From Swiss-Prot:
The keyword Ribosomal protein does not apply. FAD binds at residues 13-18. It is an enzyme of class 2 (transferase). GO terms for biological process: tRNA methylation; tRNA wobble uridine modification. This is Methylenetetrahydrofolate--tRNA-(uracil-5-)-methyltransferase TrmFO. GO terms for molecular function: flavin adenine dinucleotide binding; tRNA (uracil(54)-C5)-methyltransferase activity, 5,10-methylenetetrahydrofolate-dependent. Gene3D superfamilies: FAD/NAD(P)-binding domain (3.50.50.60). Catalyzes the folate-dependent formation of 5-methyl-uridine at position 54 (M-5-U54) in all tRNAs. Its cofactor is FAD. It is found in: Cytoplasm. Its EC number is 2.1.1.74. Transmembrane segments: none annotated. It catalyses: uridine(54) in tRNA + (6R)-5,10-methylene-5,6,7,8-tetrahydrofolate + NADH + H(+) = 5-methyluridine(54) in tRNA + (6S)-5,6,7,8-tetrahydrofolate + NAD(+); uridine(54) in tRNA + (6R)-5,10-methylene-5,6,7,8-tetrahydrofolate + NADPH + H(+) = 5-methyluridine(54) in tRNA + (6S)-5,6,7,8-tetrahydrofolate + NADP(+). The gene is trmFO.
């Protein structure tokens, strides 16, 4: 598609991603038409008409550079993020986390955007994708059905999902490899799964813990269609003692290897039950627990899933979640700049791209906004280094395995590994990754 000749850029949606995108475009001297339907049409989850409203929590999570989201926030500060700047101005005490007065914060973001001379705020619902100008779509996880259909169509009728059913993801380096074995079911293809075998006694204890664990409460806007399309592992377990044995914990075709020396039931060659772990990123540093989408509270997930042999000390880089969510098959549909592969004048940002979390959503809006502005000015696209948090997140969501793609929080597992011998002390390793990230970001910005 040819370059747009319009004298402005559209941004649809004034949540965290859309607000950030609009600001980044306007600060580069380009007029913005910012559309927001709240004020004309309410949503089930928002309480106000303010921009960048925080719906479920007032926390932007950890602020330390030894925390991946802390690193991402520092990178965003260096990129003049409107979300970070107004968040800082409205901070409330929260220990090592960054929490904000959500009303004061949202009002200040709204006021800054509404008073910006290059931003025209239009309170209206958009049901068609504009084709008059470069457009950033940032309509959030509960995109209206009408617009969702248009996004579905513009992407060839593929790759727009309505339920986020994500299994937990763990750091491979924290798996006890002496208790697991590499094998694919029936030895089909290459050995692609790490298998965590259970004896009958281990399975029964695990089943009891799983069926009695505390679930997270549902939001009112998630209840109606919550169980369509997928089933939480705890619900499956409650349907019968053996239900999981015919589902994600099926042991058939996963015989013990000849050199296996761990516990087993008598002389059986096959475990009573098996939990499979599947590689989640190209670097092989992250693995997800296959079929374990769940709505347990995070503390309960840690307690129960660490009963799985080999995962006793596992670190969870993302806990399982289940909620209604509209997100795209970004690996097939988007470039690393969040542009549509089929229409480069169309960009997406926010949770619909497969990033998970307030900070991550704002970061995606920052990347999309910068690149929309560069596209408008006919400048080369800006792809941040994979050694940075703000570079690794777009890279992950646009390069993940499409077949198993699920929304992702920022974490050190998706950032390019350090060169040289692995630093064993985790805090020192994360400090080194953060130091390299900020240096590489500064170098990138200096070259612009």
């Amino acid at each position: 598609m040819s370059q747009s000749t319009a004298t402005y850029i559209n941004v649809i949606g004034a949540g965290l991603a859309g607000s950030e995108a609009a600001y980044q475009i306007a600060k580069r001297g380009i007029p913005v038409k910012l559309y927001e339907m709240r004020g004309v049409k309410a949503t089930p989850q928002h309480k106000t008409t303010n921009f960048a409203e925080l719906v479920c929590s007032n926390s932007f999570r950890g602020d330390s550079l030894t925390n991946a989201v802390g690193l991402l926030k520092e990178e965003m500060r260096r990129l003049d993020s409107i979300i970070m700047r107004n968040g800082e101005a409205n901070r409330v005490p929260a220990g090592g986390a960054m929490a904000v007065d959500r009303e004061g914060y949202a009002k200040s973001v709204t006021a800054e955007l509404e008073n910006h001379p290059l931003i025209e705020v239009i309170r209206d619902e958009i049901t068609e994708i504009p084709n008059d100008a470069i457009t950033v779509i940032a309509t959030g996880p509960l995109t209206s059905d009408a617009l969702a259909e248009k996004i579905h169509a513009v992407n060839g009728g593929d790759g727009f999902y309505f339920y986020d059913a994500a299994a937990p993801i763990i750091d491979k380096s924290t798996i006890d490899m002496s208790k697991v074995y590499l094998k694919s079911r029936y030895d089909k293809g290459e050995a692609a799964y790490l298998n965590c075998p259970m004896t009958k006694e281990e399975f029964m204890a695990f089943h009891e813990a799983l069926t009695t664990a505390e679930e997270a409460p549902l939001n009112s806007f998630e209840k109606e269609k919550y169980f369509e399309g997928c089933m939480p592992i705890e619900v499956m377990a409650k349907r019968g003692i053996k239900t999981m044995l015919y589902g994600p914990m099926k042991p058939v075709g996963l015989e013990y290897p000849d050199d296996y020396t761990g516990p087993r039931d008598g002389e059986f060659k096959t475990p009573y039950a098996v939990v499979q772990l599947r590689q989640d990123n190209a670097a092989g540093s992250l693995y997800n627990i296959v079929g374990f989408q769940t709505h347990l509270k995070w503390g309960e997930q840690k307690r129960v899933f660490q009963m799985i042999p080999g995962l006793e000390n596992a670190e969870f880089v993302r806990y399982g979640v289940m909620h209604r969510n509209s997100y795209m098959d970004s690996p097939n549909l988007l470039t690393e700049t969040f542009q549509s592969r089929s229409n480069p004048n169309l960009l997406f940002a926010g949770q619909m791209t497969g990033v998970e979390g307030y900070v991550e959503s704002a970061a995606s809006g920052l990347v999309a906004g910068i690149n929309a502005a560069r596209l408008f000015k006919r400048e080369e696209a800006l792809i941040f280094p994979q050694t940075t948090a703000i570079g690794s997140l777009p890279h992950y969501v646009t390069h993940a395995d499409s077949k198993h793609f699920q929304p992702m929080n920022v974490n050190f597992g998706i950032i390019k590994e350090l060169e040289g011998p692995r630093i064993r002390d985790k805090k020192e390793r994360y400090e080194a990754i953060a130091s390299r990230a900020l240096a590489d970001l500064d170098t990138c910005l200096a070259s612009l």
